[in-house]
Amino acid sequence: MLWIWQKKSNNVHDLNSHIWDAWADETGSIGKAYGYQLGIKHHYKEGDMDQVDRVLYDLKHNPYSRRIMTNIYNHEDLHEMNLYPCAYSMTFNVTKEKDSDKLTLNGILNQRSQDVLAANNWNVC
């Protein structure tokens, strides 16, 4: 998932695998899906950030917020996606253990489908 989250890429060549080739065009793009959606800059009072940078900002500055999330199921762009997002949103939160300074990062992945037999080892975060 680093090709989507770290590179904010929608190009299957960045994956270095052929599991998604069927959905890619001749350049390797899967359209306005996955990394493309995460990389779009949005305007916040703290400045312009994409979704990944916003998650990192919030985890650093307000780790107990219930608003730390991403969503890449953008209805406006679905017609330009070669593959509708299967894993379409993430919600993050931080918890603190009682009587301890230990913090735990929790993540909840929402997905509409999961190809367990064909792609489970590629599609997990």
Which sequence ranges carry the predicted segments?
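Terminal, non-catalytic protein-protein interaction segments that mediate quaternary/complex assembly
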Residues: 1-125
